[in-house]
Amino acid sequence: MLKEVRPAILVMLALTLITGLLYPLAMTVVAGTIFPAQAEGSLITRSGQVIGSALIGQEFKDDKYFHGRLSATTAADPNDSTKTVPAPYNAANSSGSNLGPTSKALADRLKEEVDKLKAENPGQPVPVDLVTTSASGLDPDISPEAALFQVPRVAKARGVPEASIRTLVAQQVKGRLLGLLGEPRVNVLALNLALDAAKLQ
């Protein structure tokens, strides 16, 4: 019996060692050597302080900043552990809203957001990504169209010409990966940091 079981035990121990210890350690070393910033979470710092990650969206409410996609992340209800409460941009609880296309709550929220954005920029079509959440609820990027839609508000709040803000947006647009994958996008945190750093006139 032991003769038949021994090979299985040895294979299990060998695979556990390889896949559970050696491979993860090797990948950690390789990632830390070749892609140190990404391995640390693509953190963004200002004046030596970590202010965010290029991979996780943040909430910007001030009119002088570009706003990202809406977030549907939640947290446990402190009064009832069987329920959740909205907790936007909560990276510990990444998730979508799970509201389907027939949901009245979703339709009402979309209408409210669209109406608010139309009032902000009358006559312009509202980009879809400004009123919808992503699957993770934490997308850090918006489309170039969503960024350009917000230019009049940001320019007015900062008292600078729209053309200066448009130029800055154009500089922050990232193209498709390898020219094929994904869509052009703008990282909202990077754009807002560039906005603060720029001497716009």
Curated annotation (Swiss-Prot):
- Name the record gives this protein: Potassium-transporting ATPase KdpC subunit
Q: Which Pfam families match?
A: KdpC
Q: Name one GO cellular component term.
A: plasma membrane
Q: Where in the cell is it found?
A: Cell inner membrane
Which controlled-vocabulary keywords does the entry list? ATP-binding, Cell inner membrane, Cell membrane, Ion transport, Membrane, Nucleotide-binding, Potassium, Potassium transport, Transmembrane, Transmembrane helix, Transport
Polar residues bias: start-end ranges: 73-84, 91-101
Please give the start and end residues of each transmembrane region.
Answer: 9-29
Taxonomic path: Bacteria, Pseudomonadati, Pseudomonadota, Alphaproteobacteria, Hyphomicrobiales
Q: What does this protein do?
A: Part of the high-affinity ATP-driven potassium transport (or Kdp) system, which catalyzes the hydrolysis of ATP coupled with the electrogenic transport of potassium into the cytoplasm. This subunit acts as a catalytic chaperone that increases the ATP-binding affinity of the ATP-hydrolyzing subunit KdpB by the formation of a transient KdpB/KdpC/ATP ternary complex.
Using the UniProt record, give the first listed, main subcellular location.
membrane
